[in-house]
Each structure stands twice: as C-alpha cells, then as structure tokens.
From Swiss-Prot:
This is Palmitoyltransferase ZDHHC4. The keyword Lipoprotein applies. Residues 1-2, 89-100, 215-255 are lumenal. The active site is at C179 (s-palmitoyl cysteine intermediate). It comes from Mus musculus. Its EC number is 2.3.1.225. Interacts with CPT1A. PROSITE patterns: DHHC. The C-terminal di-lysine motif confers endoplasmic reticulum localization. It is an enzyme of class 2 (transferase). The gene is Zdhhc4. One of its GO terms (molecular function) is protein-cysteine S-palmitoyltransferase activity. The keyword Metal-binding does not apply. Residues 24-67, 122-193, 277-343 are cytoplasmic.
C-alpha cells in the first residue's frame, strides 16, 4: 500500500475519532465501552506498566504543569520554521504577493499576545473579598446551581455558574473549562482572550494551509506536470493523475507536503472547536453547563425524593439575553471595584 493511501487512512481515522468523541461525549454508552475496553486491557497488561501509565496520565491531565504549553509552542515553532525556511522562499521565487506571505506572521503576533493573556490572566478566582459581589452577578436556577451551596474545599459560597477546578484548586466565576494548552482555567474574566486566541490560531493554520496549497498548485501549473507521462509497473506509459502527482510532490517536497497535511487537519479541528465556542458565546452558555445540562436535574444536592408522577426539573438557560448582550457580557465582564477605606 503506497504512502498516499496510508496517509489518507490516517487522516480519516483521526477525524472520525474526533467526531465520535464530540458526538458521543455525553453518552453513557461510550463510557461503558471505554471502561469495558480498559478492563479487558488490564487483564493482559502487566501491573507495573499499568501503574506507570496511570501515573503519567494523572500527571498530564490531573495536575497543573506547563508541559502542554511547551508542546504548543514547540509545534507552532516547527510549523513556522518550515514555512519560513522553505515555503516562503519558494513562494518569493514564484512571485507571490509579499503581504499575502506575511499574513501568517501578523496572525502569529496577535495570537501570541492573546495566548499570553489567556495564560496569565485571572479567570475569575472567587475569594473572600469578591464573594459577595459575584453572588449577585447571576441568578440561581436551583437546578444546576442551587442557592446557599458552599465549596467544601475553598469554604466559600458558590455563585451561580461557578465551579471548583481540581487542577488549579480554586473556585472560578462563570467556569467554562480548564484548558491544558494554556495551563489555566477559562472563566468570566479571560474568556474574551481565549476566543481571540482561538480565532487567530485557527486563522493562522488556515492561512499557512492556503499559502502552501497555492504554492504546490502554482508549481504544478508552471512545470506542466499534468501533461507528463510515467512508466507504470508493467511497463506501460500512463498519463499523470492526481494520485501520482501527490506522490511525486511528496518525494520532491516531503516536508512541505507533510506540513500541508498537518495544518489542514489542524485547521479543520480548530475550526470545529471555534464554531462550538462561538455557539456557546452567542447563547451565553459555558462548556461546563452544556456538558451537564441534560442531566443536571438529577445531580442536585441535597438529594430529594422524586415522585414518578412529578415532572423532572430540566435545566434551562436563563442567562441568555440576546446575541449582542451575550457577547457584551463576555467581552465586558462584571468585575468588582475595590475602594480604599477612609480613615
């Protein structure tokens, strides 16, 4: 099986896995399948190896550390290094427009600014000083966010839409999720930075993919490769087709073709997640609320007896006040003002 088929199978497998995870992330069946597979594997994998893998996974996904920030910057650096060293130079030889070639660098500069802000900004940490203020920002729905509930770890009253982050060990106002790529929680006060960071990251990947694809197409057009022929395995001359052309380009420019495949997949994944994040912003939901929304009524505390004849209390989004108001709330979040006490 040639390289192109294997590469396409790899891309298809990766995309299918991501789509299935997104679709069935709220399904109990998926959890049962994963747990069943883990139990089967535990019978054949040595205990020492299992403990090592569990320790590694715990360190990666259940503790706060900068590993994914380093990985993020490393991958971004490798992509831009390849773009600068090869794609940019070849495109200049083919007389591409300079502003067009510099656009990825502009997007990178903006992206790094908002990446830093997302990493460093306070997501909305709840403290004794701002507890009373944050309790008044959002209404309690008494389903997902009951009144008078306290965080047993922080010993603070929990404002509506807040959540305690296990990795950061703090309660976060309007908690969305903990992002390992920025090593920080995404909350009320840094969601705006996160959205712009995600938007510029998607745009930079898509721009590099577009420039790289345009270079390869220009190269094929200039060299008239479509008019050439090649000798097949049985000794017959064949006209150049798309499959042969891609394989030829990979042999001639392996790093550029691999870069193109990587940024195309990355652009698709980022674009999908960006659309999801924008949907949540437009409807004034958080990832935490979206994930728990379908069964939040049965997770209330304290637990109460439920009569079969009574209708279950389903979570409803009471915080959406229209598209403009929802976006204004994200980009101009409510923050407490601290005044010095006069003597």
């Amino acid at each position: 099986m040639d390289f192109l088929v294997l590469f396409l199978f790899y891309l298809a497998f990766l995309l299918i896995c991501v789509v299935l995870i997104c679709i069935f992330t709220k399904s109990q069946r998926l959890k049962a399948v994963v747990l069943g597979g883990a139990q089967v594997c535990s019978r054949v994998i040595p205990q020492c190896l299992q403990r090592a893998v569990q320790t590694l996974l715990h360190q990666l996904f259940h503790t706060r550390h900068p590993t994914f920030i380093v990985l993020h910057l490393l991958l971004q650096g490798l992509v831009y290094a390849e773009y600068t060293c090869e794609v940019f130079g070849y495109c200049r030889e083919l007389e591409f427009s300079l502003p067009y070639l510099l656009l990825p660098y502009v997007l990178l500069s903006v992206n790094l600014v908002f990446f830093t802000l997302t990493c460093a900004a306070n997501p909305g940490t709840i403290t004794k000083a701002n507890e009373s203020f944050l309790l008044q920002v959002y209404k309690f729905d008494d389903v997902m966010f009951p009144k008078n509930s306290r965080c047993p770890t922080c010993d603070l009253r929990k404002p509506a839409r807040s959540k305690h982050c296990r990795l950061c060990d703090r309660c976060v106002h309007r908690f969305d999720h903990h992002c390992v790529w920025v090593n920080n929680c995404i909350g009320a006060w840094n969601t705006r930075y996160f959205l712009i960071y995600l938007l510029t990251l998607t745009a930079s990947a898509a721009t590099i993919a577009t420039v790289t694809a345009a270079f390869l197409l220009r190269l094929v057009t200039v060299s008239d490769l479509y008019q050439e022929t090649y000798l097949d395995d049985v000794g017959h001359f064949q006209a150049v087709d798309t499959v042969f052309l891609i394989q030829h380009l990979f042999l001639a420019f392996p790093r550029i073709v691999f870069l193109l495949g990587f940024v195309i997949v990355l652009s698709m994944l980022l674009a999908g997640y960006l659309c999801f994040a924008l949907y949540l912003a437009a409807t004034n939901q958080t990832t935490n609320e979206w994930y728990k929304g379908d069964w939040a009524w049965c997770q209330r505390w304290p637990l109460v007896a439920w009569s079969p004849s009574a209708e279950p209390r389903i979570h409803q989004n009471i915080h959406s006040h229209g598209f403009r108001s929802n976006l204004r709330e994200i980009f101009l979040p409510a923050t407490p003002s601290y005044k010095k006490k006069e003597k």
